[in-house]
């Protein structure tokens, strides 16, 4: 299954580079370049992961992140901030708002892909449950009890 990545980046050159590299790795990439489009896409397409620039037209990346984290449906989507903001205070603010990772520009495509794979792997592992339920029967896989 292809993972769906939402790339929110207003620099078209960076968009193209990321889309090219992620497509080569088997990801499906949807791109947008402003905050309002990002909110619309994340709500209607529910990506597996969001790569989010901070400084965007219409709505900042931190505000988009805040809206994602405040939505019951969307709050578990992993978000990687990809931004030119390099100050420690910016990084801390992003993590406090709910970013899962933070990468500063200029960046390595290989590192961005590796961090994406790691986040998606962790999210996939967390989605498995220790119990299986069927009608009134519950099987606990950890302690092997019914």
Residue ranges and their predicted role:
Residues 16-24:
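Charged docking surfaces used in two-component/phosphorelay signaling
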Residues 9:
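Conserved acidic carboxylate
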Residues 26-34, 41:
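Short hydrophobic/Thr-rich beta-strand motif most characteristic of the beta2 strand and flanking loop
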Residues 15, 57, 75, 87, ...:
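The feature encodes the CheY-like receiver
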Residues 53, 83:
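Active-site residues of response regulator receiver
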Residues 3-4, 118-146:
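Short, Lys/Arg-enriched segments at the junction into DNA-binding effector domains
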